[in-house]
C-alpha cells in the first residue's frame, strides 16, 4: 500500500470516528484490527449516555419527582420495540392495518403475532354459562339433573327434539 492510500484510509477512519464522538484508540497502530469499536445500537447506552441519564435522574429527583425509568432510546422507547398483534388479525394486518401502524409508530419496531384464543374462550364461557343456567333451572324446578344421561339434553338447556321419522319413537 503506498503512502497516499494509507494516508487517505487513516484520514477517513479518523473522520468517521470523530463524527461519532469515538476516539481512535488504535491510531498509533493502524495495522491492528479495530475490534474494540462496536456499532451504535440505540438500546445500549454508551458512557456519555449513562452520564446524561444519571444527570437527568438527579435533576428530576431534585425537583421532588423521583424518576424510576429504565434506559430508554429514541423518543423514550426502550429498545428493541415489539408491537404485539393477535394471530386472528393477521389477514387484516397484511391487507392494510400493518402499514398504518408502522407508519405512525415513530421508531423502528417489529410486529410479533401471538396466539389469540379469545374467540374459543368466549365460546367455552358461553357453553359453561348455558350448562350452569340449565342446572340452576333444574334445581329451581325440583328436577333431578343427574337422573338422565347428558345425551338427552342439548347445549341450549332443554331436552333434545327428535326431528324426522324418529320423532314419535323417542
Curated annotation (Swiss-Prot):
At neurula stage, expressed in the region close to the heart mesoderm. At the tailbud stage, expressed in the pharyngeal region. It holds the Pfam family Ripply. InterPro entries: Ripply_fam. Induction: Up-regulated by retinoc acid (RA) in the pre-placodal ectoderm (PPE) during development. Residues 51-78, 142-170 are annotated as: Disordered. GO terms for molecular function: transcription coregulator activity. It is found in: Nucleus. Residues 142-155 have a biased composition (Polar residues). Residues 51-61 have a biased composition (Basic and acidic residues). Keywords: Developmental protein, Nucleus, Repressor, Transcription, Transcription regulation. GO terms for cellular component: nucleus. The keyword Transit peptide does not apply. The Ripply homology domain and the WRPW motif are both necessary for its transcriptional corepressor activity on the transcription activator tbx1. This is Protein ripply3. It comes from Xenopus laevis.
Amino acid at each position: 500500500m503506498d503512502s497516499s492510500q494509507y494516508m487517505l484510509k487513516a484520514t477517513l477512519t479518523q473522520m468517521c470516528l470523530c463524527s461519532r464522538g469515538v476516539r481512535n484508540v488504535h491510531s498509533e497502530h493502524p495495522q491492528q484490527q479495530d475490534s474494540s469499536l462496536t456499532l451504535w445500537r440505540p438500546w445500549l447506552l454508551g458512557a456519555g449516555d449513562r452520564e446524561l441519564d444519571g444527570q437527568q435522574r438527579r435533576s428530576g429527583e431534585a425537583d421532588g419527582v423521583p424518576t424510576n425509568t429504565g434506559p430508554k432510546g429514541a423518543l423514550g422507547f426502550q429498545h428493541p420495540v415489539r408491537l404485539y398483534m393477535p394471530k386472528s388479525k393477521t389477514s387484516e394486518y397484511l391487507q392494510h392495518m400493518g402499514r398504518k401502524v408502522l407508519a405512525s409508530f415513530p421508531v423502528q419496531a417489529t410486529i410479533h403475532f401471538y396466539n389469540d384464543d379469545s374467540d374459543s374462550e368466549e365460546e367455552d364461557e358461553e357453553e359453561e354459562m348455558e350448562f350452569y343456567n340449565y342446572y340452576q333451572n333444574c334445581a329451581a324446578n325440583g328436577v333431578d339433573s343427574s337422573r338422565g344421561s347428558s345425551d338427552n339434553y342439548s347445549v341450549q338447556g332443554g331436552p333434545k327434539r327428535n326431528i324426522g321419522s324418529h320423532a314419535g319413537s323417542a
